[in-house]
Amino acid sequence: MQQVEHLVDTLHLEDLRNDLHPSIFDDNDDYDMLIVRLPVIIEKLEAISLGFIITQDGSYLFNAAKNRLEDLESRFDGPHHKIDTLLDKLLKSFHSYQDQISDMEETLYDDTVQTNFMTQWLTLKRDILRIERIMHRTSAVMQDMIHYYETDESFPMNHYIDIHEHCERILRSATLQLSKLDYLYNFYNTRTNEKMNRLIFLLTIISAIFLPLNLIVGFFGMNTSGLPFTEGANGTLSVVTGLVLLVVTTSLGVHLWRRKIEYSE
């Protein structure tokens, strides 16, 4: 094991120790280095980097906790098993994102949107964008590895093609969910704007009704002589009756105007 570590370049060892290192395949004379970065969804989205050293005789997995290379059972099957296990878990756990987006879509159709809609939308957008970014790089690296070893008779081509297809499948799913999120965002904005327009329209109607009333009240509030209805016992009743008639007339006019607009649309 120590002999293998002596073969590995110092810079490559630093890459293996880097928990945030992106996926990469680097071929060398004495060994090849493969780093595969994959998303992991447990309670929240995380990402881990698996580092492998592949020699002519075997393969080794870098154990970050123990800071050393550990021998795998076979040259190609060992890395395949580690990567394939994480991909299977990712495929299953990714369904939770799809379910959340479907639920959000249903709430929009049923007009039962929760108050935390945008917070949930931003969280999903951030996580799925991160998954798409990671899987795009990982898929390309796996393709590079397949091309490099395709002439090696001991290389299990079908196994690694299967890994590449899983990467592409997750990538396509992430892209599809992102397009759905964009659609939901536009739909949500449309519904919100409609509600805002209705509110503004209602405020306009209220203003149209009460503005003439305010003018009339202000007129009769002037402390000047010669105001109408100041003489006689039924002056107040006459003013109230006039105000009621004005409200009814204005409301009827606004209603007819609104019906005309709706009919033209």
Predicted regions and their residues:
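Peripheral, non-transmembrane regulatory/ligand-interaction domains of membrane transport proteins
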Residues: 1-153, 162, 166-169, 173, ...
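Hydrophobic alpha-helical transmembrane segments and their immediately adjacent juxtamembrane loops
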Residues: 168-169, 175-265
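Long amphipathic alpha-helical coiled-coil segments
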Residues: 146-157, 184-193
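Leucine-rich repeat
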Residues: 154, 158, 176-179
